[in-house]
Regions:
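Amphipathic alpha-helix face/heptad-repeat signature
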Residues: 106-110, 135-146, 173-177, 206
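A glycine-rich, basic-preceded beta-loop-alpha segment at the flavin cofactor/substrate interface
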Residues: 77-104, 118-132, 151-155
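Flexible, small-/acidic-enriched active-site or ligand-binding loops
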Residues: 52-80, 91-94
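C-terminal helix-coil-helix/basic helical segment that borders enzyme active sites and/or dimer interfaces
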Residues: 126, 144-182, 186-198
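Short, contiguous, pocket-lining structural segments
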Residues: 68-71, 102-113, 138
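Glycine-rich phosphate/cofactor-binding loops in nucleotide/flavin-utilizing enzymes
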Residues: 194-223
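Glycine-rich flavin
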Residues: 1-28
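A short core secondary-structure module
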Residues: 22-56
Length: 223
């Protein structure tokens, strides 16, 4: 495995070294906020220009979804971030807890994908004997219940005193949302047949979106 980005204190700033496997909007955004870990257990946030250099090397990533987003991997080799470009330094453990909470709050995008797929699945029903109808009904009932759970999870995590139990419940809920989106988009593809694989058809796009959300803001609990 390639080493994550490390931050080493140097005169006038911090030196960043290591590998970032995922950076979006390269070639689009002017500045990027990069996080690196120091030996003292800190997370150091610094701003770097969105251009390649001898110390920052991008590698394009061919992706099945969001290919127009300019997503690359970045390798840092002695990239010095001046003190005036450092936007924050915080303890790693505190940052991890905050990041996990943020990543676990609310799954409206995932559930939106499921909702759209279910609506299209219902529209694809040929007659009253088509299994797409009962499948859409069952998925729709599950979606309604999941939306209610989403509200409850959001309420629990919004409490500053929320515990690891609440975070665990949120991770489990997120997994349920992802599974629902995948089952809904797969059912839609099965119902519409081979035409659903055409790039102009929403079925394949929704299936790819559901796949993307599996890795977006992924946490260890989520894996």
């Amino acid at each position: 495995d390639q080493q994550a980005i490390t931050a080493t204190r140097v005169k006038g700033g911090w030196r960043f070294d290591g590998h970032a496997p995922w950076a979006t909007s390269w070639g689009i955004a002017d500045l990027f906020a990069v996080a690196a870990e120091s030996k003292a257990g800190e997370v150091v946030w610094g701003l770097i220009p969105g251009t390649a250099s001898g110390s920052v090397r991008p590698t394009s990533l061919p992706l099945p979804v969001f290919s127009a987003t300019g997503t690359v991997a970045l390798d840092f080799d002695g990239c010095v971030v001046a003190d005036e470009k450092v936007i924050g330094v915080e303890q790693l453990n505190a940052w991890r807890l905050t990041d996990q909470r943020r990543a676990s709050i609310g799954q409206p995008a995932v559930l939106g994908v499921a909702e759209r797929a279910i609506r299209l699945l219902r529209a694809a029903q040929h007659d009253e004997h088509d299994p797409a109808g009962p499948t859409a009904d069952a998925l729709s009932d599950e979606l309604a219940s999941t939306w209610e759970q989403d509200d409850a999870v959001l309420t629990a995590l919004s409490d500053p005193s929320s515990t690891s139990v609440a975070l665990g419940a949120a991770s489990a809920h997120r997994a349920s949302c992802l599974a629902l989106a995948h089952r809904s988009t797969t059912a839609l593809l099965a119902a519409v047949g081979g035409g659903g694989m055409d790039l102009s058809h929403p079925a394949q796009r929704l299936a790819r979106e559901a796949m993307f959300y599996v890795i977006q803001a992924q946490t260890a609990d989520g894996r």
